C-alpha cells in the first residue's frame, strides 16, 4: 500500500516539476519562437537582391543584373515585426502556449518517468536503450494529446496585423480553424511532430549520458553541501543546452515542414508532399530557415526547463 502511495506521489511530483519548468521556459523565450515560426513560413517576404554579372568578351563590356531572393535574417524579421505590428506581436501565441506548455511538459515528464520505470525492468537499467524508448514513448503521447493547442499557437504566430488592428485571440483562432477545416484541422502537422520524436530521442539520450558523466565526475563527487548543489545545477543546464543543440541541428527540417502544414489555406497536404515541394521550389537550405532563432531559443529554453524540473524534483523529493 505504501509503495502504491509513494509511486502516486512521485508521479504527481514529476507532473508538477515538469509543468513549472515548461511555463518558465515558455515565457522567457516567446519572442524568439514567434520570429522562428515567421522564418519557417512560406509567406516570409523574401528580399530581392540584384547581383551584377559581368560577361567577358562582350563588345561593350557591360554587365547584366541577376535578381536573387535572399531570406531575411533574425534581426530583420524582428525589426519588421516591431515597426509594422508593434512589440505586442512578439508575444503572439503566448496564451495557448501557457495553456499547453504546463500540461504538455507535465504529461511528458510523467510519461517519461513512468516509461523509464517500466523499461528498466525489461532492459539494462538506465541504459541508452531505456532512455531512448522512454523519451520516444513520452513524446508520442504528448504530441498526440497536445497537437490541437500547438496548431492554434502556430496560426496565431503566423497572423500578420498592422499596428492598431485587432488581432485574433486564442478562442477566435480555434473557432476559425474549426469552421474552415473541421476537427481534422487541429491535427495538421501531427505527422511532422511524430517525425520530430527523433529530436527528442537524440536530446534525452545525450542529456542522460552527460548527466551520468557529471555524476561520476571526480570534481562533483569531491564537493559537499551547497557547492555540490550549485555545481550540479549549472552542470545540468550545460548538459541540457548541449543535448538540445545537437538534437536541433540534426532533426530541424521537421519543424519547417510542420509549420508549412499548419499554415492557413496551405498548398501543403502531407509530410512527404511538403518535403518534396519545399525542396523543389526553395532548395535544401529552406529546411534550415530559422535554425539560428531555434537554437538561441531552444537551448536556453531546454536548459531552463530541464534544470527547473530537476531542481524542483530535488527540493520536493528531499522533503518528502
Swiss-Prot record:
Gene Ontology annotations for the cellular component aspect, listed alphabetically: mitochondrial inner membrane; mitochondrial membrane; mitochondrion
Catalytic activity as recorded in UniProt: UTP(in) + UDP(out) = UTP(out) + UDP(in); dUTP(out) + UTP(in) = dUTP(in) + UTP(out); 5-methyl-UTP(out) + UTP(in) = 5-methyl-UTP(in) + UTP(out); 5-methyl-UDP(out) + UTP(in) = 5-methyl-UDP(in) + UTP(out)
**InterPro entries the UniProt entry points to:** Mitochondrial_sb/sol_carrier, Mt_carrier_dom_sf, SLC25A33/36-like
Give the subcellular location. Mitochondrion inner membrane
Asked if the Swiss-Prot or TrEMBL record annotates the protein with the keyword Transport, the reply is yes
Q: Which UniProt keywords apply?
A: Membrane, Mitochondrion, Mitochondrion inner membrane, Repeat, Transmembrane, Transmembrane helix, Transport
Solcar repeat positions = 9-118, 126-213, 231-315
Look up the domain of life of the source.
Eukaryota
Family (UniProt): Belongs to the mitochondrial carrier (TC 2.A.29) family.
**Membrane topology label:** Multi-pass membrane protein
Write out the GO MF terms. Answer: pyrimidine nucleotide transmembrane transporter activity
Annotated coiled-coil segments of the chain: none
Q: Name one Pfam family in it.
A: Mito_carr
Protein purpose = Mitochondrial transporter that imports/exports pyrimidine nucleotides into and from mitochondria. Selectively transports uridine, thymidine, guanosine, cytosine and inosine (deoxy)nucleoside di- and triphosphates by an antiport mechanism. May import (deoxy)nucleoside triphosphates in exchange for intramitochondrial (deoxy)nucleoside diphosphates, thus providing precursors necessary for de novo synthesis of mitochondrial DNA and RNA while exporting products of their catabolism.
Is Magnesium given among the entry's keywords?
no
Q: What is its main location?
A: mitochondrion
Q: Which residues cross the membrane?
A: 12-32, 49-65, 121-141, 190-210, 233-253, 298-318
What is the protein's species of origin?
Mus musculus (Mouse)
One annotated GO biological process: positive regulation of cell growth
Q: What is this protein called?
A: Solute carrier family 25 member 33
